[in-house]
A protein has these predicted regions:
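Extended, charge-rich helix/loop segments that form flexible
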Residues: 1-81
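Generic signal for short, ordered secondary-structure residues
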Residues: 31, 57, 89, 119-120
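Short hydrophobic-acidic sequence motifs that mark active-site Asp/Glu residues
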Residues: 84-86, 166
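C-terminal active-site subregion of NodB/CE4 polysaccharide deacetylases
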Residues: 1, 6, 97-177
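Residue-level signal for pocket-adjacent positions within structured domains
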Residues: 65, 90, 162
């Protein structure tokens, strides 16, 4: 009974956030994404995702990832053509759902990868996964030498409202193709 009330509260919270979310996903899709991204316990999320994957794909996660995600060589090519590479955390978790220690771990692991592969500059940026952050995350980014961080607000940045750790960016899910 206690768990069902907790889940009900989470669903109500997600539903109230949906009205503020500007995306082309329908409400059901947004609810399912939020549950699988952060609201359910991590072990349960992984179990559900693995089951969904195995029921819908007749290949390994590794093969899917190889086909749909950039590999190191492709990322180096992007960098060579003058693009900046920033951090986005290591496991793509909602930063506002993590404590300070876990945030630092996520950011540091990501930076280690980028530095090891010579893909990040001294002045590096960070993009909050899903746009989720809080003040502790900003403090941690500053502590690690980050120069700027991006939200998912689907807005234009205004010079008179410039906050370098709360810069707007457009999420690809907010663009109709």
């Amino acid at each position: 009974k206690k768990n069902s009330k907790k889940i009900s509260n989470k669903l109500n919270k997600i539903i109230s956030e949906i009205n503020e979310t500007k995306t082309y996903d329908n409400k059901t899709t947004i609810i399912i994404k939020r549950l699988l991204q952060k609201e359910l316990p991590e072990r349960l999320r992984k179990k559900i995702c693995r089951k969904i994957f195995n029921e819908n794909f007749r290949t390994s996660e590794k093969k899917i990832a190889k086909e749909f995600y950039l590999n190191l060589s492709e990322i180096k090519t992007i960098k060579r053509y003058g693009n900046e590479i920033g951090s986005h955390s290591f496991n793509h978790l909602w930063m506002n759902s993590l404590n300070s220690k876990k945030q630092l771990s996520e950011i540091k692991k990501s930076l280690q990868f980028w530095k090891k592969n010579k893909l990040i500059n001294k002045k590096w940026s960070f993009c909050y996964p899903y746009g989720g952050y809080h003040r502790t995350c900003i403090k941690n980014l500053k502590k690690l030498g980050c120069s700027a961080a991006f939200l998912v607000q689907n807005k234009v940045n205004k010079i008179n409202e410039f906050k370098k750790f709360e810069l707007n960016r457009v999420d690809c899910n907010q663009i109709k193709f």
